Amino acid sequence: MQPDPSGSGGDGNANAKAKLAPPPVTAAGGRPVSVLPHKTANVRDHYRIGKKLGQGQFGTTYLCVDKASGGEFACKSIPKRKLLCREDYEDVWREIQIMHHLSEHPNVVRIRGAYEDALFVHIVMELCAGGELFDRIVAKGHYTERAAAQLIRTIVAVVEGCHSLGVMHRDLKPENFLFASAAEDAPLKATDFGLSMFYKPGDKFSDVVGSPYYVAPEVLQKCYGPESDVWSAGVILYILLCGVPPFWAETEAGIFRQILRGKLDFESEPWPSISDSAKDLVRNMLCRDPTKRLTAHEVLCHPWIVDDAVAPDKPIDSAVLSRLKHFSAMNKLKKMALRVIAESLSEEEIGGLKELFKMIDTDDSGTITFDELKEGLKRVGSELTEHEIQALMEAADIDNSGTIDYGEFIAATLHMNKLEREENLVSAFSFFDKDGSGFITIDELSQACREFGLDDLHLEDMIKDVDQNNDGQIDYSEFTAMMRKGNAGGAGRRTMRNSLQLNLGEILNPSNS
């Protein structure tokens, strides 16, 4: 095995937060200059970097080959220009540490090493070439409660493994589980620990992170612990059994309202034919009171998980597979479009926010106080009350320091107003509409999938889910309707914001709203 160039192997200490070495800082005391605590070899000295496998909000994953052994791995390359503040640097370093910390778990993707150069941080890890969880189920064409029980057993075993080592995943969703290979018996592996945190018993967290459908109610209420991972696994189980999420609405805010107050539906098809034991487990994983929710260990001891005779082996209704296909396809198309928009935002746009930050930060301290925010809002003509300004302040202040730093300010102001601006939607639509016909066809979607390194097995479903007039293609109005519906993907590293932070962006950038 390659020696670990990051020097960040796990030491089994659950309270590992304390050992998180801060990256070096520039002489001026500003943004860090590196993520890793010491210099590493160049990744290309050891690996040949090959084709693109996929692209996320913060990094691109490539196939890479070990020059010494010929073994194939995955290399996630994170551009340092996307790390806007100290907290972003620390997040990447923490992700590397957590991957080392969990590397002995059989269902966690194994890290091989981390490298850094002037422009990128590279994380080399085990290659999982077997595709995403839902894609495998859909490709099979049928599955049973017993098969669903086996999948949830694996997912919750990962959660239990994380919690036993003092790690909270915080972004459990089907897209973050990949099969190691295309083999029928390939193990399922958890990936993407970019939002994960070290914790110790009794710790409570307040930053709102995760992905809308899967986020626990206590996360939205800004006071949560590891129990939130069990809720997310419960959402995955619900989707596996019926093909749609338990809490659904047309907008992100609507999804959150449903999560906080909505009723679980066990009446619609196929629930009447699902076993009582499965429904009991779902209820107890999706209990809104985290103190009464099952722990990961208790889930693994539930009869539906433990006893093969309890989970029926008869095929689940084929309509569930059809829904699952649509749900998965919709996520992929929207994610591609979101990435196109994120990549198209210019330095000038962020530069404008930088100037706005400087204008409000009158003492050049690098942070905005309540008084500075109040004065800044007054200067742009806002008539908010002190109470409303305080609410905005608390919503944008991710680390609860009482001030807003540059990274928090960018995250709070560079969000939905950019996504929903007409020119950004036009630009994203044009990316897919290669021939400029005004329609996105199946061939154009196939080409886009290849450019993003995505499997294009379910292109018909991608189109069908968005195509309101059933003409077999997507026009601009259908595309924008999809983009403005409840957000299908995660908003990434600390950028899933509540409405107060969206309002902060709108108030400070009225011309962009």
UniProtKB/Swiss-Prot annotation:
Highest taxon in the source lineage: Eukaryota
Coiled coil: none
GO terms assigned for molecular function: ATP binding; calcium ion binding; calcium-dependent protein serine/threonine kinase activity; calcium/calmodulin-dependent protein kinase activity; calmodulin binding; protein serine kinase activity
Catalytic activity entry: L-seryl-[protein] + ATP = O-phospho-L-seryl-[protein] + ADP + H(+); L-threonyl-[protein] + ATP = O-phospho-L-threonyl-[protein] + ADP + H(+)
InterPro entries assigned to the protein according to its UniProt record, in alphabetical order: CDPK_Ser/Thr_kinases, EF-hand-dom_pair, EF_Hand_1_Ca_BS, EF_hand_dom, Kinase-like_dom_sf, Prot_kinase_dom, Protein_kinase_ATP_BS, Ser/Thr_kinase_AS
Tissues expressed in: Expressed in roots.
GO terms of biological process kind: intracellular signal transduction
Domain Protein kinase: 47-305
Binding locations of Ca(2+) 3: 433, 435, 437, 444
Stretches the record annotates as Disordered: 1-33
SMART domains, sorted: EFh, S_TKc
Residues noted as binding ATP in the record, renumbered to the chain: 53-61, 76
Induction profile: By N-acetylchitooligosaccharide elicitor. Induced by UV-C.
Cross-referenced PANTHER family: SERINE/THREONINE-PROTEIN KINASE
Name of the protein in question: Calcium-dependent protein kinase 24
Protein's organism: Oryza sativa subsp. japonica (Rice)
Gene: CPK24
